Amino acid sequence: MQKNRLTGSMTLKYDITDWLYVQGAVQRDGYNLEFKQIQPTGAAADPQGWMTEYSRSFSEMNLNYLIGFNKEWGDWSVGATLGGNRQRTINKMFYTTDGGRPFIVDGLWSVNNLSDKRSKKDYSEYRVNSIYATADFGWKNQVFLNLTGRNDWFSTLNPDSNSYFYPSVTLSWVFSDTFRDNMPDW
């Protein structure tokens, strides 16, 4: 079996002001996998012998872009982002087997030497386009409210209903900071 994988990413960020920035990123992940299985002729389990070859190629590319800001006013902090993502994934697979028939020439282990070659080829590609936003509010670095929203559009779904929205709300309180003066000294 042989597997070759290539993964990489690059991010660029530009600060427009001390509180406003833009950022872009590109990420790629991909691999190629190949393997061959051979049962030679004359083996007790399968005297006719058999052979299988398999190869798969996978690639995923992501492009991310956003604009964001972080600002503080007295006891308050505010941060927000607005961005998007484009994802493209490609899968290719090729499979060849002997169909349970013997080799033409004994000892020649090649798919071209199969008396009954059966192959399967598969290809799939899909895309996901997304937009998202976040808003973060803080008070005295103790109470935090986080709002998020994301919408994805999937190429593999019916165009009339291929959109999904994911909202979230989080509220947290660091009570130990609020009651710091009244906490025991353990």
Kindly label every feature range from the protein language model.
Residues P40, D98, S163, P184-D185:
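Sparse recognition of residues in long alpha-helices and their boundaries
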Residues N91, D177-T178:
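A generic secondary-structure boundary signal that marks alpha-helix termini
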Residues T178-W186:
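Outer-membrane beta-barrel translocator/channel fold
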Residues M1, K36-M51, K92-S119:
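Surface-exposed loop/turn segments flanking beta-strands in extracellular/periplasmic regions
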